[in-house]
Amino acid sequence: MASHFFSAFSCLYSYFVLDVTNQAGINKGITTWEQVNLINEHIRTYLENKGMKILDIYVCPHRIEESCQCRKPQPGLLLKASKEHDINLAESIIVGDQDMDIEAGKNAGLKKVIKI
């Protein structure tokens, strides 16, 4: 899978890449912020070693029943990233493997969505 990922997304290497992730395990008590941050830093390092730079990582720790605005498919984290990094979402692309990823992009005003 990893080799297909890198060949498929090599065209994104010149773009700003943000990682927006739901991690309800934090609020469920299954994992900790420290563990999630360690995993995210491992992913960041791995991807950077492959030539893909991750500009920032955004994590929602909430469970579905908490009804927050940051858990995908809500657009909260995408809007926050847009504001913090001065990103025009209408000119951005969201790539995700879940319907909620694509819905979050659409809810944030992205016109280009790719489901893998």
Region spans (language model):
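Acidic, Mg2+-coordinating phosphoryl-transfer loop and its flanking beta/alpha structural elements
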Residues: 94-116
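Basic, amphipathic juxtamembrane/active-site segments
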Residues: 1-8
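Substrate-recognition element of Asp-dependent hydrolases with the DxDx(T/V) motif
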Residues: 9-40, 52-66, 105
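Short helix-capping segments at alpha-helix termini
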Residues: 47-53, 86
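Conserved hydrophobic residues forming the short capping helix/wall of the S-adenosyl-L-methionine
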Residues: 43-48, 82
